[in-house]
From Swiss-Prot:
HAMAP family, alphabetized: Ribosomal_uL11
UniProt keyword terms in alphabetical order: Ribonucleoprotein, Ribosomal protein, RNA-binding, rRNA-binding
Family label: Belongs to the universal ribosomal protein uL11 family.
Assembly and binders: Part of the ribosomal stalk of the 50S ribosomal subunit. Interacts with L10 and the large rRNA to form the base of the stalk. L10 forms an elongated spine to which L12 dimers bind in a sequential fashion forming a multimeric L10(L12)X complex.
Keyword RNA-binding attributed: yes
Ribonucleoprotein in keyword set: yes
GO molecular function: large ribosomal subunit rRNA binding; structural constituent of ribosome
Function: Forms part of the ribosomal stalk which helps the ribosome interact with GTP-bound translation factors.
Protein name: Large ribosomal subunit protein uL11
One GO BP: translation
GO cellular component terms given for this protein: large ribosomal subunit
Organism from which the protein derives: Methanoregula boonei (strain DSM 21154 / JCM 14090 / 6A8)
Length: 158
């Protein structure tokens, strides 16, 4: 029976230490080989926490599946900020271009509850509300109203 280990690792910087080492060590596989493959596959997500699934079969062979980082991590990267606002309704942490919100929605679409790009983008902008990040220089709730009114349909309904 295959063993499955799911962990969050820093993109391109996984190590044999926790959380990977202790989880993989008892399975009897080459932890360094797993770490090297994870780092190769997550290099493009440098600086973000990336969900990784390692499946190990009975013959000690492994496969590494890399997930997409959380929406908040993608927003922080696109907006060039360290963290969201401690007071999202009072202080603005940064600004996210609308095109970046659409890009994030396209990346995350498969794992979201939304079926359409328009609603997925609304989910991303909604996350900006709780992070205190403006979208296109406007408060995220204004952008949500604009999306609902169809002002961004030319971008979202391609």
């Amino acid at each position: 029976m295959a063993e499955v280990v799911e962990v969050l690792v820093p993109g391109g910087k996984a190590t044999a230490g926790p959380p990977l080492g202790p989880a993989l060590g008892p399975l009897g596989i080459n932890v360094k080989a797993v770490v090297d493959e994870i780092n190769a596959k997550t290099a493009s997500f440098n600086g973000m926490q990336v969900p990784v699934k390692v499946e190990v079969n009975d013959k000690k062979q492994f496969t590494v599946t890399v997930g997409i980082p959380p929406t908040t991590a993608l927003i922080k990267k696109e907006a060039n900020i360290e963290k969201g606002s401690a007071e999202p309704n009072a202080k603005v942490a940064g600004n996210l271009p609308f095109e970046a919100a659409v890009r994030i929605a396209k990346m995350k679409l498969e794992g979201m509850l939304s079926y359409e790009l328009k609603t997925a983008t609304k989910e991303v902008v909604g996350t900006c509300v709780s992070m205190g990040v403006n979208v296109d220089g406007k408060r995220p709730k204004e952008v949500l109203a604009d999306i609902a009114a169809g002002k961004y349909d030319s971008v979202l309904l391609k």
